[in-house]
Design a protein with these regions (language model features):
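Phosphate-binding P-loop
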Residues: 1-2
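Walker A/P-loop phosphate-binding motif and the immediately C-terminal alpha-helix
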Residues: 5-41
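Active-site signature of alpha/beta-hydrolase-fold catalytic machinery across serine-
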Residues: 21, 25, 48, 144
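N-terminal phosphate/diphosphate-binding loop that engages ATP/GTP or pyrophosphate donors
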Residues: 28-93
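Cytosolic-facing regulatory segments adjacent to core modules
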Residues: 78-87, 91, 96-132
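Conserved catalytic-core segment of NTP-binding enzymes
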Residues: 111-211, 221
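C-terminal boundary of histidine-terminating zinc-finger modules
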Residues: 225-236
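C-terminal alpha-helix
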Residues: 241-253
């Protein structure tokens, strides 16, 4: 059974950055290949991990809907979907990436989605660690794209508005009865003078633990240039913070 971490947060708070650094940290700490799932149509997890997927699950879903009866001879729909999903999985340095891609258009996707959910759950079980970069509204979790999460990481920026958004996401997770072993808050981009204020705002808000990740000029430059976060130095204080956080999250559950 895999250890699954779902990362959520509103746009612009560094959700995908935290996801990418968690993938890297888990691989470097354990030596295991990590499964990275980009479940946000507006995300660029592949870019931050230094790979560009040529296929997405969304592309496959649309293709199946348009040509469901035009399949290779002797191959069932389920076999075809599973084969295409394997092709859509990109191998990287210490990780495998699967991108969900565009959201559903008009039409009935129930049968296709059921096959995809089954394949995704079975594929996740082949990995020791899975990191899912989710949509802010957690639609994939609510549709049971995955069975359960060991840790739900809610990412915020160091503002009151950001914290309030995280609070709503946590409440939403509870309302949807998503199976979560631990809820964690990550306040990203914190500068030194903000730490006491951030810690005060986070107090009593999360069931598990609150973490702060500092601001980094090097990280900001990599993001601005669209470069892989795997290039971030081992000694960078952001990466060290995420690495320490990943250790604690694993031991919480």
């Amino acid at each position: 059974m895999s250890f699954r971490i779902a990362v959520v947060g509103k746009g612009g708070v560094g959700k995908t950055t935290i996801s990418a650094l968690l993938v890297r940290a888990l691989h470097e700490r354990t030596g295991k290949v990590v499964m990275a799932v980009d479940a946000d149509p507006n995300s660029n997890l592949g870019e931050k991990l230094g790979v560009m997927p040529e296929r997405t699950i969304g592309d496959l879903r649309e293709k199946m809907l348009k040509s469901a009866d035009d399949l290779p001879a002797g191959q069932s729909k389920q076999e075809y979907v599973e084969y295409q999903m394997r092709l859509a999985t990109v191998e990287g340095d210490g990780f495998d990436l699967l991108s969900m891609g565009r959201p559903e258009g008009p039409g009935c996707y129930c049968y296709i989605n059921n096959i995809m959910r089954t394949f995704l759950d079975e594929a996740m079980d082949d990995y020791d660690f899975v990191v899912i970069d989710n949509e802010a509204g957690m639609e994939h979790l609510s549709r049971r794209t995955t069975k359960s999460m060991d840790v739900l990481v809610a990412v915020s920026d160091p503002t009151k508005t950001g914290m309030e958004t995280v609070g709503r996401l946590v409440s939403l997770a509870k309302e949807m009865k998503i199976e979560v072993g631990c809820l964690a808050l990550v306040v990203n981009g914190v500068r030194g003078q903000q730490i006491p204020v951030v810690e005060q705002m986070a107090e009593g808000m999360i069931q598990c633990k609150a973490f702060t990740v500092p601001f980094s000029d090097d990280l900001a430059n990599l993001n601005a240039e669209g470069r892989s976060l795997l290039e971030l130095g081992e000694s960078d204080h952001v990466f060290r913070a995420v690495k320490a956080m990943s250790d604690q999250l694993i031991h919480f559950v």
